[in-house]
């Protein structure tokens, strides 16, 4: 399978830990950040580059007002625990946005639903696997 998970011998809960273990740039880690949309309690997933911080105001401008997603909300809406949230295969389909910064790389690495699991894919494949999620500017200026 082209997206078969790579199982690491230790959990990697941050982008930096994942990059260090994989020997790749931290920006190549596609981290999944979950917010709670206030209007309907729907999960909002931002798949962002590991070396960037999500700008919540930019996301809210595209999705509506956001609230904090605690660990229970993340688990209920995605089926995954914080630290292992995959960018796809969620319990409930989230509103999904892809950070355009990921397009800097030919290959990115994402969590495979477990803190020890990651998988590689091209940013275009990530778009396809998320059902054509929009690629947008959702990060803080560097």
Specify the residue positions occupied by each region the protein language model found:
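Extended, low-hydrophobicity, polar/charged segments
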Residues: 1-142
């Amino acid at each position: 399978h082209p997206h078969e998970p790579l199982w690491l011998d230790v959990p990697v809960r941050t982008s930096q830990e994942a990059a260090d273990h994989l020997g790749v740039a931290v920006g190549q880690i596609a981290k999944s950040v979950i917010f709670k949309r206030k209007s309907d309690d729907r999960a909002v997933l931002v798949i962002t580059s590991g070396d960037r911080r999500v700008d919540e105001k930019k996301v809210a401008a595209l999705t509506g007002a956001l609230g904090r997603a605690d660990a229970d909300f993340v688990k209920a809406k995605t089926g995954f625990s914080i630290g292992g949230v995959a960018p796809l295969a969620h319990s409930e389909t989230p509103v999904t946005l892809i950070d355009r910064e990921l397009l800097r790389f030919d290959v990115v690495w994402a969590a495979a639903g477990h803190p020890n699991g990651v998988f590689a894919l091209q940013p275009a494949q990530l778009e396809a696997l998320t059902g054509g999620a929009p690629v947008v500017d959702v990060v803080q200026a560097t």
